[in-house]
């Protein structure tokens, strides 16, 4: 399926889902990364700029360039955006837990609590304004369990949930090209495409380092085995991958099925095959 067809299928599915459950306005957390950027553009194409509400949720490890990219995206799209820091609620959680358990939130507990603080704010705004919360997750992250239950896994619908990370970049590039060809402002800032993806939940954090594999390699393997039905051996031969590493990765994918069971619905479209 071509990039434009993938993009439009996601937009159509998002619009149909919202209409089916009675929502005409949506809210999206804007991180300045590729997933939230592409999701926001899709939402504008589905509902119109006046019906899309962006929320920046900077935390203790958010970078200035990510905030700038999120603000630039919102300006390019002409959508309403607000900034709500998670630092105070996150610190409050830390203090309450330390008071009872005499320990500081560190590592994964700290990272996941930040993600859940963001979701509490987004859901509060959703409830207060009757805005449907749009999830921004993709299929690569879901496969690897690289997400926080009841944090960034929350949302009513995930328009990118059927696309692997490399294809999120592809459809984002395609959408920018369409805007440029029409003489319009390219909605997604160039920096969003070139910077390394990061959850920004810890100092210097990078997605691919945290997962132990780059998205391009991961996606090629997952598409070959899970979408096209190739055996692990055949996929590794064709792609030049180490079979032991591939087997380990696929075992990890299987181990995170419990997380995927709690992910929101996504477009029922056969993107690969």
Q: Positions of the model-derived regions?
A:
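ATP/NTP-dependent adenylation/nucleotidyl-transfer catalytic domains that generate, transfer
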Residues: 1-31, 36-273
